[in-house]
A protein has these predicted regions:
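Phosphate-binding P-loop
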Residues: 2-7
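N-terminal phosphate/diphosphate-binding loop that engages ATP/GTP or pyrophosphate donors
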Residues: 26-98
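Short, hydrophobic/glycine-enriched beta-strand segments
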Residues: 9-14, 38-41
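Phosphate-binding/switch loop-helix module in NTP-utilizing enzymes
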Residues: 93-136
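Conserved catalytic-core segment of NTP-binding enzymes
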Residues: 127, 132-224
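Short, hydrophobic alpha-helical segments
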Residues: 112, 116, 217-233
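Glycine-rich phosphate-binding P-loop
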Residues: 11-28
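Short, well-ordered secondary-structure micro-motifs
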Residues: 50-53, 104, 140
């Protein structure tokens, strides 16, 4: 039986592809270099077709519904390699068939249980950062950050389903006025079925891609994530 993991878990999701979820994780790893991060990317695929880009690729396990690999080379340019290059202590890639994520959870749990906590005290929960929306079906992480771009009309069902669980919203385009309500109205106008009521009361941070991490987001995570007791997973 996989061991129970005691960890602070930060999940980064987003409403569509190519809006900088991986880039945000890279920025967060760099912002907290002493966190001894275990980082991971979770990919679901269908019939040999990659969920990222829609083309056939080698991310689909050939014989099994799930596969998990630890990244060992920070220079390959893959997303999991980028996590290592940014300073993560360990980096993994979990792949499952579409709709079969539950079958991959024992592998994920066992991998996190085996990962060391680096220089963290033995009784301190390890710090884990994962890229996924669907993982929220199976856990309530310490923090869930949702990456949004109101000018991108595509909206994943998994992102829509869990938007009300977001602890904070990261916008990839700067609103025309410095006001949280402007961002909320943009979302409501751009995406059918997304109401501003889902976003009410949630912190909003603006970080266009390739710009520095907002300092107020760093403060938010230092207070909300690193002071949290962690969860059992």
């Amino acid at each position: 039986m996989p061991r129970t993991v005691h960890a602070r878990i930060l999940v980064v999701g987003g409403h569509t592809r190519n809006i900088g979820k991986t880039a945000l994780i890279v920025d967060l790893i760099r912002a907290f270099p002493d966190a001894a991060w275990t980082a991971g990317k979770i990919t679901q695929f269908g019939h040999g077709v990659c969920s990222r880009g829609g083309a056939a690729c080698d991310c689909a396990p050939d014989e099994h519904t799930v596969a998990l690999d630890w990244e060992s080379d920070a220079s390959t340019g893959t997303d999991s390699a980028r996590f290592l290059e940014a300073g993560a202590e360990r980096s993994l890639w979990l792949r499952t068939k579409q709709g079969r994520l539950a079958e991959g959870l024992p592998l994920l749990r066992e991998a996190l249980a085996k990962a060391s906590g680096g220089a963290l005290p033995p009784d301190c929960p390890r710090n884990v950062i994962l890229e996924s929306n669907s993982l929220l079906q199976f856990m309530r992480p310490s923090i869930y950050l949702a990456v949004l771009d109101p000018q991108e009309s595509d909206f994943k069902d998994s992102a829509r389903l869990f938007l009300d669980r977001a602890d904070a919203l990261i916008f990839r385009r700067r609103p025309p006025a410095r006001a949280e309500e402007t961002a909320k109205r943009s979302v409501e106008a751009s995406w059918l079925g997304v109401s501003s009521a889902l976003l009410a009361g949630r912190p909003v941070f603006v970080q266009p891609e390739n710009e520095p991490l907002p300092q107020d987001l760093v403060v938010f995570l230092r207070e909300r994530f690193f002071n949290s007791p962690g969860i059992l997973f």
